[in-house]
Amino acid sequence: MTVARFDGVDFSYPLAEPRRGHPFALRGVSFDLAEGEVFGVLGPNSAGKTTLIRLLSRIVSPTRGTIEVDGVALTAMTRAELARRIAVVPQDMPQGLPFTVRELVLMGRYPHAPRRFFETPDDLAVAREAMAATGVLDLADARVGVLSGGERQRVALARALAQEPRLLVLDEPTAHLDLRYQVECVALLRRVNRERGTTIVLVSHDLNLAGALCDRLLLLADGRVARLGTPEEVLDETLLTTIYGCAVSVERNALTGRPVVQVAWRR
């Protein structure tokens, strides 16, 4: 079953300077997201990854083409309807927010009862489960502004899980996490995907994270689809060397059999 679809999507920022000879941040992008899959979006800087997130969040709308979730155009949804379907975990959560962790995570429940002013026992239970799953339950009464970057990242993920979306969009989810929490984050995402059937879109510069976690990958370059396929099909030495402009080698992880990308560093 298809959860979301991009169909011939172009996007250009108004009055923006042309990038690399063309004004489009995305051009002719088409792909489907299947229910329950983990889908990675890769590409160098200025490839269009952030624009894709902004389109899914409806911060901006396509210049041409359509984006649908559950067969409904994003432009036809109310904000509450959109938030019940899609949750976005940004790369950076603003510092200095005047909320406790519990209060911020409970905000993920607002789309389910936009006219309700008080949390129900069910809301509290869902929020507690989300905090426990992300390892921030012991920080529930702490102010978000005093947390470390890694802790704020896990709180943002907890809020998204409390939203109970059909589609979870993650922008560099391990960017502020140490090695231990990177491993735990990947394990959590796999568990959410497996137990809840949540479709996950992972936007990342980390080719190896995407290769280890994702069922399919979309590689963008200059706003266009360079390749769409399995990690084995997309993480190709010749293709990556061309797109990223540096020599790489691709081997197999001895434990998982998944492709691993290594850069030929110069001394």
What are these regions (language model features)?
Residues 42-44:
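The feature captures the beta-strand-to-loop junction immediately N-terminal to the Walker
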Residues 57:
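Helix-to-loop junction immediately C-terminal to a conserved catalytic motif
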Residues 65-73, 82:
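Conserved ABC transporter NBD signature motif
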Residues 117, 143-147, 151:
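Conserved ABC ATPase signature
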Residues 164:
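Conserved catalytic motifs of ABC-family nucleotide-binding domains
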Residues 168-172:
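Catalytic Walker B motif of ABC-type/P-loop ATPase nucleotide-binding domains
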Residues 243-267:
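ABC ATPase nucleotide-binding domains
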